[in-house]
């Protein structure tokens, strides 16, 4: 591809050298400014997903644990910021490094003064706390607050960054952008925005947490039959799902990191800006297809049109397409979403049979659909898109697209390694916390609800068991509906 100087030099005649340098520097500054702004805006969108996680989690738990689950979401972001700053970013992107882990930039110390964009740190931190948020849903309603603090710091500061180093760092052993050493199976792993790096990590961690804690009291009866412990607000679940959908447009398209990159000669009007738009489309189609497939699949299974199931199916489709969103065609994204819905339905049925309790279906949704997304990418990645994004013609691409099986081999390896790494690190942590009595709350606290026993009161005023927020019935005001459903009436001057 011709450089700026090569293009402008012949056009400017005798003053070519000075004029070319000046104009090219101006273009470079403008390009850097636009790319940095694009990345920063994408980071804001990904961070807004924390609000979506908070609403989704709040609606999916019972009212008596609402304040607790909301506090854990705040904790994920706040503690995650400090631990990712101190340790996580260095383990993920500290250069120079080896293929396993980064070794520099602890506390952002000695980052390059030229060429380092702080927007990149913010963007990567937003991804790290997303992984921690996934895990919190799996262990909701029965976990001690101190356990949240410990696991969140460990996951954000160490476990997740190591995986992101493997796949997204230029030095990582599985990276498709590796600059030193040979690529895994000659291709590396194409996990563009994190079906494996983010969703599998969070899902597998949640799997171990939920397994070690055991199910919530009342989740299964004495005969072992599943008993639904429904969340208290479908409205919050829908709100959270839409906020997550919105944030995914920063999560997936934002993972290009830059937007002003041309894929052809000057004037071709074809570049990364086109790929960004296509990625948003594939993201939309996968999630939408998964939502509709889940709607009808669960209708056949249960006889109901369940909005909670549809929202979970939607998010499962997004989790699956995240790996290959940039390298597949829109029609392939529909296949991705369709299969991800059945993966989620099947894993939920298996979880009920095995008496596995995950209040938000996070292990099944993020772990299972994330793993499917990594496999899907190895099957449907298109040669043209792979060459454009990684800039090296002749790379392996999707098996079903004629690219052979090397990419699939690399992806199978990384799925197994991610599952093993998270299991090796997070399972012992949860076991130690459990052994020390720091993991699960007491049965009495669980029955009463953590909002009352651990957080000083209920999340909602006028909770049936909370008299502190109710007006005095002896004074003119409102007669409240009782716990037994008596009629609500207004007292105005003694007349009803």
Curated annotation (Swiss-Prot):
Tissue localization of expression: Expressed in exodermis, sclerenchyma, endodermis and pericycle cells of primary root tips.
GO BP annotation list: ammonium homeostasis; ammonium transmembrane transport
Recorded family membership: Belongs to the ammonia transporter channel (TC 1.A.11.2) family.
Gene3D superfamilies cross-referenced by the UniProt entry: Ammonium transporter AmtB like domains
Signal sequence interval, chain numbering: none
Record's GO cellular component terms: plasma membrane
Protein function: Ammonium transporter probably involved in ammonium uptake from the soil and ammonium uptake and retrieval in the vascular system.
Keyword Membrane belongs to the record: yes
Cited InterPro entries: Ammonium/urea_transptr (IPR029020), Ammonium_transpt (IPR001905), Ammonium_transpt_CS (IPR018047), NH4_transpt_AmtB-like_dom (IPR024041)
Membrane topology reported for the UniProt record: Multi-pass membrane protein
Source organism, top-level taxon: Eukaryota
Subcellular location: Membrane
Primary location group: membrane
Name of the protein in its database record: Ammonium transporter 1 member 2
TM segment ranges: 39-59, 74-94, 120-140, 148-168, 192-212, 236-256, 274-296, 307-327, 331-351, 360-380, 412-432
Keyword list, A-Z: Ammonia transport, Membrane, Transmembrane, Transmembrane helix, Transport
Gene symbol of the encoding locus: AMT1-2
Entry GO MF terms: ammonium channel activity
Induction of its expression: By ammonium or glutamine supply in roots.
